[in-house]
Amino acid sequence: MKTKAEHSIIADAIHEWHTVYLPCIRNLSHNALKSYGEGMGIYIDFLESSKGVTSNTICGECFRKDWIEEWIAWLKEVRKCSPQTCNHRLSILKNFLRFLAHKKIQFIKYDCDAAEIKRMQQPKKQVEVITKDTIKRIFASINTRTLIGKRDFALFNLLYSTGTRIDEILSLRLSALHLD
């Protein structure tokens, strides 16, 4: 019995991963699917432009740890991607390799090697603090003489005094309040 060529196995796996696994099993949104497809496409572009790999020559060796690390450096230096973008693209590739290893055990080495690749350090974002003066101006701008104004004042007061997120406040129901 003739075995299926490695490039064909990988091509079929990419197709199944993107058309069945991600949308049906993982239930990813349309935008997430687009992002995953772009991420995988960028890795394939890298293989073609930097390594001379074509759709007929793609193989397990194309997912070697050193090539993936080289790709991450390429993303940062050539494509000018931020650390967050590089980490996102790396997680997409790792996700595919995990899928591929589950489908065909012969690729498990590449999944294990990719799992060892560390994420790039991301700079901590500074939290923008609202000044007391700004808070006072927000409260002063609410017209508390109207019913809607009273509602808005109560909402802002609850948000400010508890530090609760708006979606948590909006999901509150009367039955959840205990005013005793």
Q: Where in the sequence are the language-model features?
A:
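Conserved catalytic core of the tyrosine transesterase superfamily
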Residues: 1-180
